[in-house]
Amino acid sequence: MTHTALVVFGDGSEEIEFSASVDVLARGGFSVTTASVMPRESKICKLSRGLKIEADINIAHVNSSYDVIVVPGGMPGAQHCAESTELVNLLKAQKSRGGWYAAICASPAVVFKAKNIVSSEKMVCYDYKDFNDALTHGGNMGHGRVAVSGKCITSVGPSSAIDFALAIVECIAGKPKADHVAKELMMTDRSHPVMQ
């Protein structure tokens, strides 16, 4: 069985978090679709350090369900994701049907918390006061570099991006598959997800 992933992004999304998610999930046997959240049906986004990426589709044309929806961080990319009504609706439907949803860096606070995707799930995020306050005051602050709470997977930032993507593979395709991908990547000392 082929697992499926939707990796969304916008202008200002973080390059490492986006590319690590796409690459590691593909290595894990996932069929990965990338979607731009930018308006006017744009598929090309300029990421946080200037790299231009063309998405497979614009978020307005997503009409499939996926095993996981992945939201990279970076600013203002996370804010663009939060402003996408289509993405917010997809995430709410994903949670409602018991699907997996994952965010890293700013996105756990800016997207998942601010848009009420989560309720009691514990999350981690980029170490920035406003993001930490949003999770702490909402009772959603977790611990570790990669956190799994229910069907919600979150992580802290660029340095944990590969571990984040491996956690997604592990949660959906199993630990042996994640271990195989980690070995391919020559990761001898990876951060395993912390169950919250």
What residue spans do the PLM features occupy?
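Extended, subdomain-level signal for the structured scaffold at the beginning of enzyme domains
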Residues: 1-99, 109-114, 119, 132-143, ...
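Short, thiol/selenol-centered motifs that function as redox-active sites or metal-ligating centers
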Residues: 104-107
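Class I SAM-dependent methyltransferase SAM-binding "motif I" and its flanking Rossmann-like core
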Residues: 125
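Cytochrome P450 catalytic-domain "roof"
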Residues: 148
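Hydrophobic alpha-helical segments of small multi-pass membrane proteins
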Residues: 128-129
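Short, well-structured active-site flanking segments
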Residues: 122
